[in-house]
């Protein structure tokens, strides 16, 4: 079995800002000419945000995550690196400085939307938060796999 989730930036206010900046980029400057660099970025930024996606997979090997296009391939937290997994509600702006790939006082976060996630505590003493709209299912599935891993390794 496997747990999977894909998330995109869907905040209406973010898309309003991006749309506004795109429209502004097509406005002529004071010389009544166009700045093609602004137009280029005005077109590329919405495409870039549309393509951004947080992908999560949980299986019997570990917890895999990819923040596309920043991560070309999945990164993995193997169960032998994990001490605890818990579903959490958090404050993205106050605790991590917003959404995206963030480093805050409470550890690293990968999130794109909302205020729910799964906190992964590592043997190293560090912790990582992965934002999730299915945080309960994610945590239950991952904890079951973590228990199975611990049982197998005790034998």
Residue ranges and their predicted role:
Residues 1-8, 48-50, 55-57, 69-71, ...:
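A generic structural signal for short, solvent-exposed coil/turn residues
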């Amino acid at each position: 079995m496997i747990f999977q989730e894909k998330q995109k930036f869907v905040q209406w206010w973010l898309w309003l800002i991006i749309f506004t900046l795109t429209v502004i980029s097509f406005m002529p400057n004071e010389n009544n000419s166009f700045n093609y660099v602004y137009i280029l970025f005005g077109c590329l930024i919405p495409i870039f945000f549309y393509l951004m996606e947080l992908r999560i997979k949980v299986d019997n090997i570990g917890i895999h995550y990819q923040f596309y296009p920043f991560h070309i391939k999945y990164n993995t937290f193997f169960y032998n690196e994990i001490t605890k997994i818990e579903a959490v509600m958090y404050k993205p702006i106050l605790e991590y400085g917003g959404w995206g790939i963030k480093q805050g006082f409470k550890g690293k976060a990968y999130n794109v939307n909302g205020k729910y996630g799964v906190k992964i505590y590592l043997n190293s003493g560090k912790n990582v938060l992965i934002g999730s709209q299915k945080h309960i299912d994610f945590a239950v599935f991952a904890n079951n796999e973590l228990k199975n891993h611990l049982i197998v390794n005790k034998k």
